[in-house]
Regions:
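Secretory targeting and sorting signals
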Residues: 1-12
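Post-signal peptide N-terminal regions of Sec-secreted extracellular proteins
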Residues: 10-157
């Protein structure tokens, strides 16, 4: 199930789904508006690619839950993190053809960003995804929700 986060600013920083709050920018960023309209940022859990054998993928998208942004697009960027020792390391390359993308709300093919990394060995490695959604020409928060941590037999180094 995808991780979700409301774009309405919280009153205090909350932990991320993966417990790695150090990867999320602070909630008090200058981009945050007290009356920002809400939308939902979503990121799926890292998983083996069904179209490119030997790689791990993560996808991010956004939903306009209350029709606040009808006809508007957002720039969606996904980050794929792998744990190396005690540190989380970003392993996907940005920019690519599919990341970031500027898309309408909805998710699915053509409405989401995709990040991936190739496996160099089959050693167990922890991964998590992160998504950043920026509505074009609108004020939104700097939230970057994380997926769950997932252990996969794919080491990227």
């Amino acid at each position: 199930m995808p991780a979700t986060a409301s774009a309405s600013p919280p009153t205090s920083p909350s932990p991320t789904a993966s417990g790695n709050s150090d990867l999320r920018p602070e909630q008090g960023s200058a981009k945050v508006a007290s009356k920002a309209a809400s939308f939902t940022s979503q990121v799926d859990d890292p998983h083996y690619s069904s179209s490119h054998a030997g790689s791990v993928n993560v996808h991010g998208w956004w939903l306009d839950d209350h029709d606040n942004f009808t006809g508007m697009k957002a720039r969606v960027t996904v980050y794929l993190w792998a744990k190396k020792g005690s540190q989380w390391v970003q392993v996907n390359k940005i920019p690519t053809k599919k990341n970031p993308v500027t898309v309408y709300a909805g998710g699915g093919g053509g409405k989401r960003a995709s990040g991936s990394v190739s496996c160099r060995s089959h050693k167990p490695t922890w991964y998590h995804g992160q998504v950043d959604v920026d509505i074009i020409d609108a004020i939104d928060t700097s939230n970057r929700p994380n997926s769950h941590d997932v252990e996969l037999n794919c080491q990227p180094w």
